[in-house]
C-alpha cells in the first residue's frame, strides 16, 4: 500500500479525529506497531502461526488501524494522554520525543523544547510526558548546566525564532521556573475542564521546585539562585509585569514557610538582602537604578514574611555603636545623598564641581534636578517605614526599636567636641546624610496630624520623654522605643514625678522620634552651613586681596574657594528640597500650637483659645525637652537665611508661631533657659517682614507676612515680651554672658524698629514707657526703665569699643602703607595681617551694634521723652551723646579715618545724624537742656559748633541744621548760668556731696544696710543695673531707701544762704 493509501485509510478511521493531526495519528500507529512486533519476537513460534496469522490476510495499514482501535478503551484516554503531553511541553518547554519534526503537527506544540535525552533513554520506549513523570523531567531539566545545547525543533518550520530559543534554553533556573509558572497560569485559563487539575498541578510543581531550589541551592551547579531572584524582580519592575512576579513569589514564600526543616525562611532570604546591600551601597542619588531596587524593598516591606526577615536583617552587630546603623541595609539607603561621602573630599563628587565656571542658571537647574530625585527618594523611604509600621505589631515594634536605638546610639552627635573632632566623629556616628534623609521620611509620617487644628496633635503625651529605662517587653507593651530622653533638659524643672499612662499612641512616638532626628541631623547641618558661609566670605576677601597684590597664594585661595563652594552648594541643595521644607514647616507650626496649648494648661484633645493674662497650670512643660523648641527656632531661622520664600507663601500659619514666641519669650516661668528665650527673638526677626530685602518676582514679596504681623491680636504682649527678654539676658549666669548678650540683642533692634513703624506696636511700647514714668521708684524698677538703662549701657560700650578698634586699625594701616611690615619675617607679617583682620572683624561687629543702639534711641526719643529727661537717665544719655560727638566731629575724628569705612560698617555720618536727632527730640525739655552743660567731661560750646559744621558738610536738611544751632545757643546760655552757680557752690562740704558722683546732692537718701547717704538719682541709676548696695553688696531695692530729710534741709538752707550772700555781693 502506498503512503497516499495509508493516509487515506487512517483518515477514514473515526478514532483519528482524536489526534491533533493526521501526522500524530500516523506516528502513534507506528509506535504501536513497533511495540507489538517486539512482543511477538520475544514469544516462541507456534506451528499454527503461519496458518492463523491475520496479518497476512489483512493489508498492513488496515492492521495498524485495527490495533489503534483495540489499544484504547475510550476516546477520553487517548485525548487526555496526548493533550497532557502537549500541555507539559508547552509549560516546561521539555520533551522526550526527538522524532522527525515533520511527523509532528504544529498544533499545540512549542516550536523549541529541551530534549531530555538521559530520561528518554531511561524510559526506553515512552517518548511522551505525563503526570507520573513530569516531576522527574522537570528536575532533570533544572540540573542541565547548559540547556541551550539540548534544544530540538518540535515543528518543521525553518523560520528563525530567537525568542523560542531563549525561552526554552533559559539557563537561569529561577527565571525559568517563573516563566513556567506564567505559562501554567495561561494554560489554566485555556485548557478544557478535564485538563484543569493537571494544569494546576504543573503550576504547583513550579512553586515546589522553586522552593527546593531556594532551600538547596548547592545542588544546582553554576546557579546563583538569589542573584537570579533579585534580577528577576529588577527586570519586572523596569518592565510591566511586577505583579506577576510578586504573585509567583507569594506562593513560593508560602511554600517555604510551610517547610522550614532544611532551612528557616530567614536563612533562605538573607542572601537576597545581602545582594541588595552590595548593589545599593555603590549607587548615587540620581541613578534611576537605585529607585528600582527601592521598589523591590518596598515590596519586601509590604510582604509580611519578608518584612520580618528585613527588620531582623537590619539589626546592627553592636546596637550601641551609632556608626554601625549606617552599615545596615536601611542605613546604606539613608546614607545616599548629594552631600559629600567623605567630609572635605570633593574629588569624585558628582555634584557642583567647578561652580565658578557654571552660571547661576546652570546651578539652579542642577539643584532642581537633584530636588526631583530627593523628593522621590524620600517618598520611597517613607513608604518603607510606613509599611513596616502598619504591617503587623511585630514589624512595628522592630522598626521602632531600630529607630529608637539608632537615635540613642547617635546622641553624641550634638556634643560640642563632636563638631571639633570630625575624624573621630565619623568613626563613631552615622552621617549627616543618614539623619537628613531619616528626618525627611519621619516628617512625612507626621503629616497626617501636622495641622494646627488637628485633634490628633493634642493627643501627644509629654510624659513619654520622662520615662526612664525599660526592658524590651515593657517597651513593646507601652509603645516606648526612644531611650535617654529623661536625661534631656526640659523647658522648666519638674517639681514631681509625672503620672505615666499604660501606653502611648503612635502620634507621641512619631513626634518624639522626628524631633530628635531633626535635632541630631538638620540642626547640626544648619550650624555647618552658617560656618561654611562665613568661611566662604573670608576666603573670597582673602582671594581678592591676593589678586590685587599679585600674591602667589591667589591660585591656592581660588582652589580652596572652589572646593568650599562645592561643599556649600551640595549642603544647601540637600537641605532645601521644597517638599521636605514644607513638611518640616508644617511640623514646626504644629509644634508651636502644641507647646502653646501645654503652656496654657490644656491637657485635652481640643484646642483652647489663647487669652492674656495667661492661666496657671503648665506643669506638662516640665517633661518637654528643650530641643522641641530649639528645633522650631532653628528651622525658622534657617528658612530666613536660605529659603525665605517658603515663609512668605506659608505666612498664614505664622500666626501660631507668633503666639508661641509671645508666650515663651516673655515668660521665664514657662521657659527657664534665657539662651533659648533669647533665640526666640532671632526667630521673631526671621519670620517678620524684611522691607529692605530684594523682592522676588515669583513671590508677593513680604505682603502676607506684613499683614499677619501688623494684624497680630496680641501685639502689646509681643512687644512687652521682646523688651522683657532684652532685659533678662543681661544676667544669664553664663561666664560669657557679657559677650553673648550683644549677639542675642542683635536681632532685637530691627524688630523694635519695625514695631515702632506699626501703630499697634508703637502704642504698646509707649504704654510701657508711661507706666515706667509713673512708677520710677517702685520696689522693682519698671521694665521699660531697665530696658532704656541697658540700651544706653550697650550704646556707650559698643561705640566706645568701635572707636578703640578703628583707632588701632588706623595705626596698623599707616604702618603697612609706610612699608614697616616689609622688613618683618614671614611669620611676623602673618601675625600682623591676622591681627589687622581680627581688629577689622571686631570693629565691624561693634560698629553694626552701635549703629543699631543709637538708631533705636533716635526713634524712641521721637515720642518718649519724660523718661529720658528724668534725672535718673538724663545725665547718662547726655554724657554719652557728648562723648561720641567729641570723637565724631571734634579734633579726635582724624584717628578714626580708616581706608574704607564700609569694610568695617563705620557710618559716622549716620551716627552724627542720629545723635543730633536725639538732641532735637529731647531739646524741648528745659531740664534736659539744663543738664547738658553739667557734663564737664565732654561738653563745650565749641563741640556743638563743630557739630553744626559737620551737619552742613554731610548735607543734612536746612531745618535740622537751624534747629540744632538754636538748641546749641540755648544750651550755651544755660551753661553760662550754671557756671556762675557752680562758682557760688564750689566750697560745699563733703557731707553735701554724693560719695559716688562727687556732686552736690539734691535729694539725699540713706541706704538701709550700709547707712551711707547718696543722692536719690545716683542710687536709682545704680539699681537699674545692679540691685545691691554699692557699698556692701547687700540686696537693695528702691522701696528700702529712706529720705535723709535732715540733710536735705541743711543743704537747702546752705544753698539759700550762698544765694543770698551772692546777691548781697552783687
From Swiss-Prot:
Keywords: Acetylation, Cytoplasm, Transferase, Ubl conjugation pathway. Gene3D superfamilies: Zinc/RING finger domain, C3HC4 (zinc finger). The modification N6-acetyllysine is found at residue 386. Residues 33-57 are annotated as: Disordered. Residues 987-1061 form the U-box domain. Pfam families: U-box, Ufd2P_core. InterPro entries: Ub_conjug_fac_E4_core, UBE4, Ubox_domain, Znf_RING/FYVE/PHD. It is found in: Cytoplasm. Belongs to the ubiquitin conjugation factor E4 family. This is Ubiquitin conjugation factor E4 A. It comes from Pongo abelii (Sumatran orangutan). The gene is UBE4A.
